[in-house]
Amino acid sequence: MDLADLKNKLNRPVTLWGMMGAGKTKTGRHMASLLNLSFLDSDIEIEKAAGMTIPEIFEKYGEAWFRCGEEKVIRRLLADENPCIIALGGGAVMSTATQALLSRKALNIWLR
């Protein structure tokens, strides 16, 4: 199977998840470039939506608030179901609601 075949078979977003430093962003950008797909990073999208950095969110509102916002952003990124590559934050899969959303809406790849 070549890259064109792979791209044609993708019918949903691909998410990359793993611990911090696993290479989600680097791998995601490379995959998106090879497949000519959009690349999104959920951490960057969270910061845009909140108007502050992730450390600032944690300091001001705490982890529970952050995880709730993270789930909303991931839900938005997966809403149109078009193929794209999405790098998730290291703790995104800690939420059972986010896990369920990802299992329904995306092809998920764990990088270790």
Residue ranges of model-derived segments:
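Conserved phosphate-donor/acceptor-positioning beta-strand/loop module used by diverse small-molecule
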Residues: L102-R112
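Short, conserved catalytic or interaction motifs in soluble domains
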Residues: A22
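Extreme N-terminal, non-catalytic leader segments
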Residues: M1-R12
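Hydrophobic anchor at the beta1->P-loop junction of P-loop NTPases
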Residues: L16
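ATP-dependent small-molecule kinase phosphotransfer cores
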Residues: S38-S103
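Walker A/P-loop
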Residues: T25
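P-loop (Walker A) phosphate-binding loop of NTP-binding proteins
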Residues: M19
